[in-house]
């Protein structure tokens, strides 16, 4: 999924729009009721993720179950959360079609984990 595809999917599933709190390319996905983040799309240098080559890539940070994070991090395209709590968040490389299903599942889980306690 590209960042735009993530935004479109979240709009269809949750009725949320990306927000740009830092007036740059990085976008936050948040609940409309409690304002909690369930996703963060950032552009980061490849070297910050241990990837070869020059330039930057888009990643998606989502909240997840710590048990799942350990399992996902053994797979290509998943990383310790960049600029987030590494125990509860994971970074996923975007623009890798083979990760699309996992991205949707993890976005859904992140949305659920950050939902207001009243709604659970």
Regions found by a protein language model. Give the residues of each.
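Charge-dense, helix-prone N-terminal extensions
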Residues: 1-120
């Amino acid at each position: 999924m590209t960042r735009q595809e993530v935004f479109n999917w979240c709009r269809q599933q949750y009725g949320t729009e990306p927000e740009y709190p830092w007036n740059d390319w990085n976008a936050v996905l948040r609940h409309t009721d409690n304002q909690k983040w369930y996703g963060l799309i950032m552009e980061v240098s490849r070297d910050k993720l241990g990837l070869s080559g020059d330039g930057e890539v888009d990643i998606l940070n989502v909240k997840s179950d710590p048990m799942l994070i350990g399992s996902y991090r053994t797979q290509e395209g998943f990383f310790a959360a960049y600029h987030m709590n590494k125990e509860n968040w994971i970074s996923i490389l975007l623009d890798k079609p083979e990760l699309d299903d996992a991205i949707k599942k993890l976005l859904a889980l992140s949305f659920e984990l950050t939902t207001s306690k009243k709604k659970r």
